[in-house]
């Protein structure tokens, strides 16, 4: 309910408790760059971790660290927590929650090397529902927007030899967004974080995948939209009648040009749309619709499995794009 209000209308009573899903040790409390955005990591043992992102307030068992956390980018902690104990509060935005199981690798990631330099935990992302009791699981499922299986969604859509999945710009070393040449010529240790000359590490990222809720729709998401330094954006990738879907686009398909359009939604029958300005989640079971046209993108899977693309936001007609130009990029 708090997300239906503007930030200026929120009171302390609107913030809800963030509690531990199981016994464990809080090993990290990080400030994500603003006074109301924190990351918390809980180690539950047996290589199982739960991670909370963009948490608003540090409270409960972490209250004594609140002041220190607000002034520090990263705190390594050792705070025991019991299932159900509060360690934070949430009110101004949705809370990210993930479970990582270090014993299980997501089978839909085709490029393990890409995750060695940053977000090394991502390939271990787990479906968290089976870890909860039937009572809690039922309550959680009742709030999930996606009504089809898997209810928590999917991030590993890599299909070798097709355009589907997660990609990284050729010449870069995966998720961290650093150039291979930096590693080849390094004389000191290269860390993660900011990339020299770029606005964000995601400048080199690309994803072409089904929408996280309405999997009939395809999404084109690029860390480099118009600015080669990085200006992440995404749009609906519109598969026209007679066109092959990205998961069926192979080297034999040649170059295929798709329209891009603004992503929007329509609620299920009988459910009202969110009011303008609302931060509340879109309604459960919504479907994707497209808005204004945002250009075209040409895709071509190469014989070596790499992907060539060219994004053109100045034209909206598929027939207006006939061949790659010097603006073509290649991803692995």
Language model features with spans:
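Conserved, short, structured surface segments that act as functional micro-motifs
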Residues: 37-44, 70-156
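N-terminal glycine/threonine-rich, aromatic-flanked beta-hairpin/loop signature
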Residues: 177-254
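Tryptophan-anchored aromatic micro-motifs
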Residues: 159-178, 182, 307-310
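Beta-sheet ligand-binding and adhesion/scaffold domains
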Residues: 235-332
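Conserved "cap/hinge" positions at secondary-structure junctions
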Residues: 22, 28-31, 85, 90-91, ...
């Amino acid at each position: 309910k708090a997300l239906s209000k503007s930030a200026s209308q929120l009171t302390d009573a609107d913030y809800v408790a963030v509690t531990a899903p199981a016994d464990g040790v809080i090993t990290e409390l990080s400030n994500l760059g603003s006074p109301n955005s924190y990351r918390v990591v809980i180690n539950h043992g047996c290589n199982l971790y739960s991670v909370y992102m963009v948490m608003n307030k540090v409270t409960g068992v972490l209250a004594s660290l609140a002041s220190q956390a607000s002034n520090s980018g990263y705190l390594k902690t050792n705070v025991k927590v019991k299932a159900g104990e509060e360690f934070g509060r949430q009110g101004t935005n949705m809370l990210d929650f993930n479970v990582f199981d270090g014993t299980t690798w997501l089978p839909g990631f085709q490029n393990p090397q890409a995750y060695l330099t940053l977000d090394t935990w991502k390939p271990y992302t787990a479906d968290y529902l089976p870890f909860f009791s039937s009572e809690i699981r039922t309550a959680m499922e009742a709030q999930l927007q996606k009504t089809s299986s898997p209810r928590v969604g999917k991030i590993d859509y890599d299909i070798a030899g097709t355009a589907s999945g997660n990609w990284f710009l050729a010449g870069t070393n995966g998720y961290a967004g650093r150039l291979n040449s930096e590693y080849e010529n390094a004389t000191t240790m290269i860390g993660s974080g900011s990339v020299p000359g770029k606005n964000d590490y995601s400048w080199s990222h690309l994803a072409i995948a089904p929408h996280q809720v309405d999997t009939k729709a395809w999404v084109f998401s690029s860390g480099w939209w118009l600015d080669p330094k990085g200006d992440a954006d995404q749009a609906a990738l519109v598969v026209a009648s007679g066109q092959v879907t990205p998961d069926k686009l192979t080297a034999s398909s040649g170059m295929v040009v798709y329209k891009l359009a603004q992503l929007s939604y329509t609620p299920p029958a009988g459910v009202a749309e969110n009011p303008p300005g609302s931060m509340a989640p879109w309604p459960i079971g919504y479907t994707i619709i497209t808005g204004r046209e945002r250009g075209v993108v040409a895709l071509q899977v190469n014989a070596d499995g790499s992907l060539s693309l060219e994004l053109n936001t100045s034209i909206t007609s598929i027939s207006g794009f006939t061949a790659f130009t010097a603006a073509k990029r290649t991803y692995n």
